[in-house]
UniProtKB/Swiss-Prot annotation:
<dbReference type="Pfam" id="PF00462">
    <property type="entry name" value="Glutaredoxin"/>
</dbReference>
<keyword id="KW-0963">Cytoplasm</keyword>
<keyword id="KW-0249">Electron transport</keyword>
<keyword id="KW-0676">Redox-active center</keyword>
<protein>
    <recommendedName>
        <fullName>Glutaredoxin-C1</fullName>
    </recommendedName>
</protein>
<dbReference type="InterPro" id="IPR036249">
    <property type="entry name" value="Thioredoxin-like_sf"/>
</dbReference>
<dbReference type="InterPro" id="IPR011905">
    <property type="entry name" value="GlrX-like_pln_2"/>
</dbReference>
<comment type="function">
    <text>Has a glutathione-disulfide oxidoreductase activity in the presence of NADPH and glutathione reductase. Reduces low molecular weight disulfides and proteins.</text>
</comment>
<dbReference type="GO" id="GO:0005737">
    <property type="term" value="C:cytoplasm"/>
</dbReference>
<keyword id="KW-1015">Disulfide bond</keyword>
<dbReference type="InterPro" id="IPR002109">
    <property type="entry name" value="Glutaredoxin"/>
</dbReference>
<feature type="domain" description="Glutaredoxin">
    <location>
        <begin position="1"/>
        <end position="102"/>
    </location>
</feature>
<feature type="disulfide bond" description="Redox-active">
    <location>
        <begin position="21"/>
        <end position="24"/>
    </location>
</feature>
<comment type="similarity">
    <text>Belongs to the glutaredoxin family. CC-type subfamily.</text>
</comment>
<keyword id="KW-0813">Transport</keyword>
């Protein structure tokens, strides 16, 4: 859990992902199209990925634990929460407040 929190706090937007997960790719692409440069942590490519995946599953209360999106060091959630924020118009202000967007 400490590693997850430390990584999440290092950048404005952090996405914990799996390289073969289509929803992870979709969420990452959304942020890129909005002009955000997210830090993507590929759990299946990290030696401590399984440990982080278990910690994220506990935080999210579900499995699979990816994608897990943190904005401004806070857990936002997974695909459903990110898309809900985007469609309601609340994602961009959240990104601005976190310093991930300047415009």
């Amino acid at each position: 859990m400490d590693r997850v929190n430390r990584l999440a706090a290092q950048r404005a937007v952090v996405i914990f992902s799996m390289s073969s997960c289509c929803m992870c790719h979709t969420v990452t692409r959304l942020f890129c199209e909005l002009g955000v440069n997210p830090t993507v942590v590929e759990l299946d490519e990290d030696p401590r990925g399984k440990e982080m995946e278990k910690a994220l599953a506990r935080l999210l209360g579900r499995s699979p634990a990816v994608p897990a999106v943190f904005i401004g060091g806070r857990l936002v959630g997974s695909t459903d929460k990110v898309m809900s924020l985007h469609l309601s118009g609340n994602l961009v202000p959240l990104l601005r407040n976190a310093g991930a967007l300047w415009v």
